[in-house]
């Protein structure tokens, strides 16, 4: 699962299968902005979950 780019922002997901959680690191112009934490079930988070979290973040922050 690679980085997602939207309007000058980069969203880089990472996750731990053992702990069943992850985070999406948000960057703007290479500078760290914040971290979006999430939980998931299974071997890896579904791509749709990551997309939904990114879309929600963009909507809430008017990106």
Indicate where each model-derived feature is located:
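N-terminal acidic leader/helix
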Residues: 1-39
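Mixed-charge, Lys/Arg-enriched low-complexity segments
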Residues: 31-63
